Structures are given as structure tokens and as C-alpha cells.
């Protein structure tokens, strides 16, 4: 029975911790469920609906119109006192100079642009999540080092205070250690504020109080083929600009259409004539009528003072602008990836060097600390060794953090799904 209660107690104690257990994959998923991505999804759906709506607008359409008309006071004998009519119209566009096809292709291009924008936003949110994740891990380790530094200085300050009270330590040594101790407290508070700011950004991004845990990392990039979204968007803008030229050219051609109208009338004339003429009026004035009208029509703008030519010229310039923008985006992306690749190599060398520096700083501090406790070195050397030790720790954590975030930026600029490159 005791073992049963013990297991229950352990489960209840560990359950909250299990609920807090998180990883980077989960954080990315949470970040991609926020409002900005949902908006992009809805905008992509809107683009698809625009395309489908335009296609259906070009299909034959059937419309019905109906009305009741009453004429009072003075009216002609041929005007009915009351009239009820209905009209059914069938309309179909046969040819519009290619505008229909160009418009549908343009809407397909807009749909693709909306999709690319959505996917870019999804990867950008993953980049934000990764940046916040590694910034948190790095800052937590730096805070731990800050706390150790505060603890070292506090114990040293308290020991020196006793020596000073006993007349065994100088005033300047005590004040120097005291100042360093309070500066370390300030540094700790500043880093805690930075962590609070990161937690605020996490809340904004994911709408949760996500607790960063684990030691995730990203795969080291190889020579990845770039599928940068900005470049793909710029290239698709060229296709959209070309369709705008086709739409402008279509205005030079005539439009042919078919229209069929079926009309039905029911009239109550009630003519204001004397009785001898009433029967005669009834014979000539139809109370019921119906008819069908078939139209094969054409519309053609023949002259417009070269307004269409100017429109075509303007759209051709837009094609040149889109081409120039695509070339620039491609060159920019290529150079950015080259720079990030070089940065990664330098950061790897930096991490190796900082590891060696940290080992050396730890050994130096251990030696100086023992000598300082024995009174063999001055407090100046002690403070320098202490500062070097914790600076080496902070520098190493910052370099590791920058290395992971630079990898994330490399994948983002290459247009590669960041979530697929995360390793737990």
C-alpha cells in the first residue's frame, strides 16, 4: 500500500515538470500557429477563390429580371394600366482578344505568389523561434556564470570585510572588491532583464509561456541548392508582368458575344374609351405576349488617341523592372549565402579558440585564487583572473549561440525548411 501511495506521489510531483518539458520542434510548431501565419493561409485561400471566381465568370451566365408596373392618371391608350413582365437572359463571351486567357494566367500567378509568400512567412516564423530558443539557452548559461561570479565576489568581499575590521586588509582593496561585487550584481540584473525581454517575445510569437529546454542544434550546412523564396517571388513577378502586357494588347481586338433574351408580358390595359369601342380595343391590345431575342454582338474600340499603346508601353516597362528586380534578388541571395558560409567557418574556429581560452582562464584563476587566499598575489591580479574566467565563459556561449543562429539564417536564405534541419 505504501509503495502505491509513493508512486502516486512521485507521479503528481513530476507531472508539472513533464508538462513543461518542451523542445525546439514543438516551439517551431507553436510559432507557426500564430495569427500572422493564419492570415497568410487565408490570403492564399483568397487568391485561389479569386482564380476560381474569374474562371466561372467567363462561363455562360443566366439571369432573371422581373417587375410590376402600374400607370395612373393620364396615359395613352396603348399604355397598360398594370403590367407584369419577366425577362430571362443568357450571356456568353465568345472572344475578347486573349484577355480572358491572360487574366486567368495572371490569377494563377497571383495564387502562386500568395503561396510562396505564405511559405516564406512560415519559414521566417521558424527562424524567429530558433533565434529565441538559442538566445534563451545562451543567456541562461551566461546568467549561471553571472551567479557564480557574484557568489565568488560576495564570499571574497565578506572575508575581506572581516580582515579589514581586524586591521589586516587595506581600505582600497576592500572598496575595489565591493565595487566589483556590486557591478556583478548589476550585470546579473541586466541579463535577467534581457531574459525577460526574450520571454516576452516568446509569448508574442507563440501565445504560450514556453519553457526552453533541451540541447537542440541544427545540422551543419553543406553546399545546398538555393530555393530562396524572395528569388522565386521575384521570378514569378516577371510572369505576372508579362500577362499584364497581354491584357493591354487584348484591347486592340474586337469582342464577340452571344446574348439570348426571352420576354414574357401580362398586361391589363383597361382603356379609357366609351363602351362601343371597348371590344375593338381589346382586339388590338394584347393582354399576354412573349418573345425571344437572339443577339450575336461585337464591340471594338477603333480609335482612342493611342491610349492603348501607352498602356502597352507602360506594362512592358513593368516587365523590365521585374526582370531587373529578379536579377538583383538572385545576386543578393548568392552573395549572402557565400558570406554566411564564410561566417560559419570563422565561427567554428572561434569556438575552438574560445574553448582553449576558457580552459586556460579556468586554470589561471584556480592558481591565482589559491595564491590570493594565501596572500601571495594582489587583489588586482585576482580580479583580473576572475574577470578573464567569466568573460571566457560568456564569449564561448555567445559564439555557440551565434553559430546556431547563423546556420538558421543560412537555411532560411537558401529557402530550406528550417524544421527539417533541427536535431534534438
Q: What do the PLM-derived regions correspond to, one by one?
A:
Residues 395-424:
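Acidic, low-complexity, intrinsically disordered peripheral segments
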Residues 30-36, 48-60, 88-106, 116-123, ...:
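A glycine-/polar-enriched beta->alpha junction
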Residues 122-241, 246, 340-343, 347, ...:
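Periplasmic alpha-helical coiled-coil/stalk elements that build and connect Gram-negative outer-membrane
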Residues 1-13:
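Bacterial N-terminal signal peptides that target proteins for export
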Residues 65-93, 103, 259-300, 424:
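Small/polar, glycine/serine/threonine/aspartate-rich low-complexity segments that form flexible
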Residues 11-21:
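Hydrophobic h-region of N-terminal signal peptides that target proteins for export
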Residues 164-168, 372-376, 413:
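A short glycine-centered flexible hinge/capping loop motif at secondary-structure junctions
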Residues 20-63, 94, 168-170, 206-253, ...:
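Bacterial Sec-pathway N-terminal export signals of envelope proteins
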Amino acid at each position: 500500500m505504501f509503495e502505491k501511495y509513493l508512486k502516486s506521489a512521485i507521479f503528481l510531483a513530476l507531472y508539472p515538470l513533464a508538462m513543461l518539458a518542451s523542445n525546439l520542434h514543438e516551439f517551431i510548431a507553436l510559432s507557426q500557429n500564430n495569427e500572422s501565419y493564419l492570415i497568410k493561409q487565408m490570403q492564399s485561400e483568397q487568391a485561389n477563390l479569386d482564380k476560381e471566381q474569374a474562371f466561372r465568370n467567363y462561363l455562360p451566365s443566366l439571369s432573371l429580371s422581373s417587375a410590376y408596373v402600374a400607370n395612373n392618371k393620364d396615359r395613352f391608350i396603348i399604355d397598360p394600366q398594370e403590367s407584369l413582365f419577366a425577362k430571362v437572359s443568357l450571356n456568353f463571351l465568345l472572344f475578347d482578344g486573349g484577355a480572358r486567357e491572360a487574366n486567368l494566367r495572371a490569377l494563377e500567378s497571383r495564387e502562386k505568389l500568395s503561396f510562396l509568400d505564405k511559405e516564406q512567412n512560415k519559414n521566417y516564423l521558424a527562424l524567429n523561434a530558433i533565434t529565441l530558443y538559442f538566445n534563451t539557452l545562451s543567456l541562461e548559461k551566461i546568467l549561471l556564470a553571472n551567479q557564480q561570479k557574484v557568489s565568488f565576489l560576495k564570499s571574497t568581499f565578506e572575508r575581506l570585510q572581516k580582515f579589514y575590521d581586524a586591521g589586516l586588509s587595506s581600505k582600497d582593496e576592500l572598496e575595489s572588491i565591493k565595487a566589483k561585487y556590486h557591478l556583478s550584481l548589476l550585470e546579473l540584473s541586466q541579463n535577467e532583464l534581457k531574459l525577460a525581454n526574450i520571454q516576452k517575445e516568446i509569448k508574442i510569437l507563440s501565445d504560450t509561456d514556453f519553457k526552453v529546454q533541451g540541447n537542440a542544434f541544427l545540422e551543419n550546412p553543406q553546399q545546398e541548392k538555393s530555393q530562396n523564396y524572395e528569388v522565386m517571388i521575384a521570378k514569378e513577378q516577371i510572369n505576372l508582368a508579362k500577362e499584364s502586357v497581354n491584357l493591354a494588347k487584348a484591347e486592340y481586338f474586337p469582342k464577340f458575344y452571344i446574348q439570348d433574351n426571352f420576354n414574357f408580358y401580362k398586361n391589363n390595359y383597361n382603356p379609357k374609351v366609351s363602351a362601343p369601342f371597348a371590344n375593338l380595343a381589346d382586339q388590338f391590345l394584347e393582354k399576354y405576349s412573349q418573345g425571344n431575342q437572339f443577339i450575336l454582338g461585337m464591340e471594338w474600340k477603333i480609335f482612342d488617341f493611342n491610349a492603348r499603346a501607352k498602356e502597352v508601353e507602360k506594362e512592358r516597362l513593368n516587365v523590365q523592372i521585374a526582370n531587373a528586380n529578379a536579377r538583383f534578388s538572385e545576386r543578393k541571395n548568392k552573395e549572402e549565402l557565400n558570406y554566411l558560409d564564410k561566417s560559419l567557418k570563422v565561427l567554428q574556429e572561434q569556438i575552438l579558440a574560445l574553448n582553449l581560452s576558457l580552459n586556460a582562464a579556468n586554470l589561471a584563476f584556480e592558481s591565482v585564487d589559491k595564491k590570493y587566499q594565501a596572500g601571495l598575489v594582489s587583489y588586482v591580479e585576482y580580479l583580473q583572473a576572475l574577470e578573464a574566467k567569466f568573460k571566457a565563459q560568456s564569449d564561448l556561449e555567445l559564439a555557440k549561440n551565434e553559430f546556431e543562429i547563423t546556420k538558421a539564417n543560412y537555411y532560411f536564405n537558401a529557402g530550406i525548411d528550417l524544421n527539417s534541419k533541427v536535431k534534438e
